[in-house]
Amino acid sequence: MEVQKEAQRIMTLSVWKMYHSRMQRGGLRLHRSLQLSLVMRSARELYLSAKVETHQPEFPPSRRALDPRLHPPREPEAAMEAATPDVEQPPEPMDTQEEVLRVQETPALCDPPPARVSRKRRSSSDLSDGSDAGLVPSKKARLEEVEGEATSEVSNRLQLPPAQTEGAFPNLARVLQRRFSSLLNCGPAVPPPTPPTCEAKPACRPADNMLNVLVRTVVAF
């Protein structure tokens, strides 16, 4: 019966392919090769299945049921299943679980929250006011004294002594300043009326003497 059904299936499939491949170029030749391969494959499958059925030994159902290889013993599994319920501990009641949770939460609620440190930047004026307010009056007075001494030292250093401003020879500088100021301030000397018979003398003789004195002092120093 199975061989007849397979033959009918192959015939219907081949007729259907021949009808659809009639317009193609080389369709019949291709269909013949495909049909031959299909027939050979189906024949091989039928042959192998029939051979396996003939060589397979027939066992009675009683022996198959008693075969230990097909049905291994289930004693270890039963022992394990019986031991597992004893090992498992019964779950705790809900009342005890709620009490444990309350005990764990109470210390966390009792602890005061940590003080948050403000990270805002303070201005220099706020910092200076806070530092001055926190200082003791005695310390504040000492700081003011130290600041006054520092400012006085700086002012003394900035103001040079008169000896340094005048130079290495203060007396010489003063003498030269006075001499030059007197020369600049003095005007042209008016010659006194002399008789016509006397020879005229130079009017700026004292100035020449003064210049000679100044030149000598400069050369000496």
UniProtKB/Swiss-Prot annotation:
Which keywords fit this entry according to its UniProt record? Acetylation, Cytoplasm, Nucleus
Q: What subcellular locations does the record give?
A: Cytoplasm; Nucleus
User: Per the annotation, which location comes first and is thus the protein's main one?
Assistant: cytoplasm
> A cellular component term (GO) from this record?
nucleus
Q: Which InterPro entries match?
A: IER
- Name the species this protein comes from: Rattus norvegicus
Which gene is this protein's source?
Answer: Ier2
Q: Where is this region: Disordered?
A: 54-156
* Name assigned to this protein: Immediate early response gene 2 protein
